């Protein structure tokens, strides 16, 4: 049956109109433009490997059935040439001749096949006179008629086109395919490193009745079934800690988080996160684990810990990594000592002199210290660096430092000037945790939409007893940024983009 005319057909671009007419012509002649299947016998990559030994002009009697997207077409008289490309980018030439397929099939090839079509070709494996491995066709079929033309293959796609039409990007750009493979290899390496150390992977809720586990603005939705407001999770932390309470002493999750905040070269509202917790650990042991995770991921995905970035420079992730402390490093940068006892008003004055916009009502001492530190130091941390010992006010889920009053056992890992991961010695005292939650609730009541609410069920879990624990969260997209030098939208296969 031939489809009826499209009511909007008059408005489509000319090339789409022509291709649609070819599709209709194939169907009207009793052919198939989109068959259920075709008898493919080999991938193009398999053929290239198996017949790499053929000399120029050598022919075989081996018959194969191959498929691929047409990325080059040339036809002269009784012979037509095409280059097919399969999903991984492997290409192979096919030759369609009148002697091989017959006059009608050759004419149909010339009239119906366009760049971008996916075709099936059956024939003998040969090497052309120029030494090009080829399939000399004895038959062909359309496997999927493309109604839209491909972009010009030798021209660079704009970033806008790449992120909005990743499917086109994957067809035409080897770098896009490489990025997807690298991401898969990195995630596999993270899982293997953790599983080899006895960690168990779990899944925790994406929809939550309270938002917690990080300081961020949540996405809000509503459940019709429960007639209640729900939040897309900003972090899985509080549920993974429940697992530790329940006896899963080494636990991790790789999944999506959502934060209703800005989007730029290092931030995406939807992003992938690895979060892991280890009972009987602390922020030192979890830091060692984090270094192993990153280094193993580099080796798995790129074969080396000295990775080559998109701009051609090299970045060394090997060996031991530097550690600095927040208060001493900020003091050295400012030329005056900053401690947990430094008055908030003094910090406000420093920030204003440096041109930092300050919320004088809601920003605590800790928030001011972190903002000053980021303004003065963060961008300068090119080599992998653990920044340790944060203000207590900004880290409500972290254990107080065992020696230093006013700070907590937390580090942020900076790589190439941006934050890659965060690690804690976890707060396991439910009484202190409740006090921290109460302070967060006070900030929320003052209008801080990133502050956490009191999670009574989590506190109930902690009241059953939670062992000393180290925890870490690391952005998968940012890890790819660190390993490749790309922006975050290039490391996410289908990033969120503003609707047109």
Swiss-Prot record:
List UniProt keywords, sorted A-Z.
Aminoacyl-tRNA synthetase, ATP-binding, Cytoplasm, Ligase, Magnesium, Metal-binding, Nucleotide-binding, Protein biosynthesis
Indicate the secretion signal residues.
none
What's noted on cofactor binding?
A: Binds 3 Mg(2+) ions per subunit.
Its EC number(s): 6.1.1.6
Q: Could you give one GO CC term from the UniProt record?
A: cytosol
Where is this protein localized, as stated in its record?
A: Cytoplasm
Which metal ions or organic cofactors does this protein require, according to UniProt? Mg(2+)
Q: Which Gene3D superfamilies does this entry report, sorted A to Z?
A: Bira Bifunctional Protein, Domain 2, Nucleic acid-binding proteins
What residues does Mg(2+) 1 bind to?
412, 419
Subcellular location, principal: cytoplasm
- Reactions catalysed, as given in the entry: tRNA(Lys) + L-lysine + ATP = L-lysyl-tRNA(Lys) + AMP + diphosphate
One GO MF annotation is: tRNA binding
Q: Where does Mg(2+) 2 bind?
A: 419
Q: Which CDD domains match?
A: LysRS_N (cd04322)
Assembly notes: Homodimer.
Q: Which family is this protein grouped under?
A: Belongs to the class-II aminoacyl-tRNA synthetase family.
Specify the protein name: Lysine--tRNA ligase
Its gene is: lysS
